[in-house]
């Protein structure tokens, strides 16, 4: 009986496995999507995207940069606006893992279905070189590196 108790005790003392801890940064909406259609009639339609980091608690700020690229069918200020206070560089203080990007869509004054009516937010850089941009998944190594809005009729 003593042998069984000792074996159980020492089995619990096996060397710990190192957990998978690959830090990453990604972008999505509140539903977890990486794309959305916005109707041309949408007016004052507010959308919030979120840039997330996933890592152990950092002892310093993590800076994440993104760019917003509008297709030739969209014009900032006329079709949409990235709300004031949303910077193209987000600073994640220690303990902060999610930062918002606020966008407001306006009713399309002139909608050309043949034009490129997309607005894409793409994560471009992270101050921490060991962070992966995007989620890692089998078969597709960088999910959610960008978020695309498509203006539809």
State the predicted function of each range.
Residues 1-13:
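Sec-dependent bacterial lipoprotein signal peptides
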Residues 13-153:
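Short boundary segments that mark the start of a structured unit
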